[in-house]
Structure formats: C-alpha cells, structure tokens
UniProtKB/Swiss-Prot annotation:
InterPro entries linked: PFN, PFN_euk, PFN_sf, Profilin_CS
GO molecular function: actin monomer binding
Name of the protein described by the UniProt record: Profilin-10
Provenance organism: Phleum pratense
Keyword Phosphoprotein (UniProt): yes
C-alpha cells in the first residue's frame, strides 16, 4: 500500500459521518510522504519544535504548538508518543512512530477523541510494522 493510500483510506476515512479536515504522514525531518489536499505546509522550525517535544515532553506547553503559523494550545498527550493540540472548535493529533509523524487535523463536528482514534490507530499499526 502506498503512503497516499494510508492517508486516503485510513486517515481521511469516515467516522460516524465525519472525517478529518486534513491529514498527512511526514518523516521526522518534516518531509511529506503523503498528504490530503488541504493539509497545511509545516515550517521547518515547527517540525523542530514538535520533535523536541517528543524528546522533552512539555517543551511546547508554555508557547503552544505552531502548525503553518496557526497556534494550537497543547493538551494532554502521551509523552514521547502523542502530542495533541486544540484551537477553537478544532485541533490536531500527532503520533510519532519509528520513522514517521502521523498527523490529523479536525474541526467540529468531529471530536478530539475521534481524531485521536484515527491517527493513533494508524500510528500504532505502523509501529508494529517497524515503521
């Protein structure tokens, strides 16, 4: 299966009548492996900050997490594995695997829990595959 198929079939899938606003699979350096049509372009310093938060959980909490200049308030995640952010009625979940970052961005009516479930399910699968 191609990386684009993972995005199209596993991240942008319908959950209870809703789907993510955008999604992507990135390398740890921010290189886009696959993305949905409306996925925002990360800046290099944003990827650096995200990777630092995985290495040093809590790094982004004081300043917030920036994604394509949009600021997300960092909310509870899983140290070293998952970062979650909230911005207005939407938010973001980022799951780190051995080689990739699985990213899902949502808006209402999708819920934070639905976003996390979709992103983390694919991320956990990739971890089991050694990716």
């Amino acid at each position: 299966m191609s990386w684009q198929a993972y995005v199209d079939e596993h991240l942008m899938c319908e959950i209870e009548g809703h789907h993510l606003a955008s999604a992507a699979i990135l390398g740890h350096d921010g290189t886009v492996w696959a993305q949905s049509a409306d996925f925002p372009q990360f800046k290099p310093e944003e990827i650096t900050g995200i990777m630092k938060d995985f290495d040093e959980p809590g790094h982004l909490a004081p300043t917030g997490m920036f994604v394509a200049t949009a600021k997300y308030m960092v909310i509870q995640g899983e140290p070293g594995a998952v970062i979650r952010g909230k911005k207005g009625a939407g938010g973001i979940t980022i799951k780190k695997t051995g080689q990739a970052l699985v990213v899902g961005i949502y808006d209402e009516p999708m819920t934070p829990g639905q976003c996390s479930m979709v992103v983390e399910r694919l991320g956990d699968y990739l971890v089991k595959q050694g990716l």
